[in-house]
Amino acid sequence: MKILIVRPWPSVLDVTKNTYNIQEVGLAKALVKRGHPTDILFWTDGDEMTVKVGVEGAKPIHVFYRHGKVLLKNVWFKGQEKLFARYDVLQTAEYNQMFSWHLAGKYPEKTVVYHGPYYSPFNKNYNRMCRVFD
């Protein structure tokens, strides 16, 4: 089962300098070690590129840095249909991201939303937003 982890959030995570505490990389390494080829799609406002991240005792992870439209802390990746077609599972996070909704609608048989809402007693606006998306 080939898996693509899609991060629809507009912040640059540079795996060429550091992979420590990047959740997507940790999850991808764990899946690869269990026999599931896994790659990652990250947003960038710099040069588009593909970076290989080594995994001890397994094949490397490919991290695709691609441009996307950014609006209200949402990334919309255009023109990635050929990339998405290469994978059995599209695992996205942040169920309130518009691109997560798009993937779930366009590829319902292979989209998995890994992250859901977390109630926060300190953040009333976040709790209201969760109610809207629920």
Please state what every model-predicted region is.
Residues 26-29, 84, 123-134:
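Membrane-proximal helix-turn-helix segments that form the acceptor-binding/catalytic region
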Residues 3, 89-91, 104-121:
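Active-site proximal beta-strand in glycosyltransferases
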Residues 35, 86-88, 108, 133:
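Short, well-ordered alpha-helix to beta-strand connector turns
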Residues 1-48:
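N-terminal subdomain of nucleotide-sugar transferases
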Residues 46-51, 121-123:
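Short, charged/polar "capping" segments at the starts of alpha-helices
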Residues 80-98, 112-113:
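Short N-terminal targeting/anchoring amphipathic segment
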